[in-house]
Amino acid sequence: MDAASRCDLKVFERLIRKWSPRINLVAPSTYDQTWERHILDSAQLYDFLPSTADKVIDLGSGGGLPVVVLGVLAKHRGCRIKFTAIESDARKCAFLRTAARELQINLSVITSRIEAANVEPGNVITARALAPVSKLLEFAEPLRVAGGTCLFLKGENVQNEVSEAKNSWQFEAKYYPSVTSEKSAILEIGEFYRA
């Protein structure tokens, strides 16, 4: 990670610590691990963005993990990716807008439930700590362009979630080990269809 990205992400870390006690951006038990557990965990997703990525939609963005982190990395690498955060909690949306403004990243924030969001589809859909895979695919279906990619940061139950999702969806999944937790994985799903 370059020095400019690290500097911006340290600013983001301070914003999370400042706002989180009031609006629960991250669990209080993880405040001391914000950099490793949340920011670096989100940053690893950047390397999985396809070279064709130009519009990334983040589902249930909450505290901006991973969308703000990805926006910072894209800015400092000269990538013209448009990021959209969908979040139903207006307080968290205020935080996301503050972070986007202070960090000067290309991020639009939509205050809406995911199912009701009126946004132009994207070619990458991301999510972290939001819902089981079957629900994530349900959310992603109307928001993803044909040929788009889903990148989900998942925990230790990812294999079971994928097996359960295959009861309702047809898809192939690729798993990549997390660099921040041996119990976690990055799940990549390309085309998917209702079974």
UniProtKB/Swiss-Prot annotation:
The keyword Cytoplasm applies. It comes from the Bacteria. Its main location: cytoplasm. The keyword S-adenosyl-L-methionine applies. S-adenosyl-L-methionine binds at G60, L65, I114, E115, R128. One of its GO terms (molecular function) is rRNA (guanine-N7-)-methyltransferase activity. Coiled coil: none annotated. Transmembrane segments: none annotated. PANTHER family: S-ADENOSYL-L-METHIONINE-DEPENDENT METHYLTRANSFERASES SUPERFAMILY PROTEIN. Specifically methylates the N7 position of guanine in position 527 of 16S rRNA. This is Ribosomal RNA small subunit methyltransferase G. It comes from Dinoroseobacter shibae (strain DSM 16493 / NCIMB 14021 / DFL 12). The lineage of its organism: Bacteria, Pseudomonadati, Pseudomonadota, Alphaproteobacteria, Rhodobacterales. The gene is rsmG.
